[in-house]
Amino acid sequence: MATKKHGEACHSEQSEETWFAVRQSHIHAHASQIKSKDRVSQRGEVFTAEREVNAMLDLVANECLRPDSRFLEPACGDGNFLAAILRRKLSELRRKYKKSPRDYEKLSIVAIGSLYGVDIMNDNVEECRKRLFNIWNEEYTAHCKADSFDETREAAQFIISRNIINGNALTLMCVDAEGNDTTAPIVFSEWTLIGSTQMQRSDYTMADLLLHNDTSKKDGMGNLFALTEEQKEEGGIFLRRYITHYKRVQDYEGHRDEL
């Protein structure tokens, strides 16, 4: 995780559509936690050490085991938090579906679809995407063996490309190669398993999700995707929806610059 000078850890109420925002307090920057002094001074970029990552995730350990518990990292860096969460989710799936490669495959796609990240640095975004896919693919190949398919790998890569975004979490806009805001809003895709094999993708701008999200609770907990269908559509925040086999989500590109 790349962090600014301050932050806080918080999580949403436990439900089937839980959304987590994971942040951290400022920590002393060891050499392994920074890429360069310039990036620290210009962007406040400091990566979270593994010990701190695991200590924070242990506070919500049960949610880290559910494939559909959603986590958002608004300054994800190269993915320290998201990678650790994914490992926990996949480890639990492997334990529960030791003898069922098909169920493991399907739910591992749900797990990868539950992780969201934003970072202003393009190289961090690329590294985070690659890191998450490599973790997922290593576990998928090891567990499913001959029952693993390139089609499913393509689906996982596509979902990761939609969920890990090169953007500015403060302005809620995508950014260019220099980290400057573009005219394209950050868009998140909600991935929902329907029945045994169908997956529904619903796209919303991050700005509208935050605007309509209930953050009035004293504990600061909220759920970005907790709105009813009527609220989403009446509020004008729903952008598009696709339903297809979970292995074929990549058939619907839905480029952000077309919004």
Residue ranges, per PLM feature:
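SAM-dependent methyltransferase catalytic region
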Residues: 2-6, 13, 19-26, 30-259
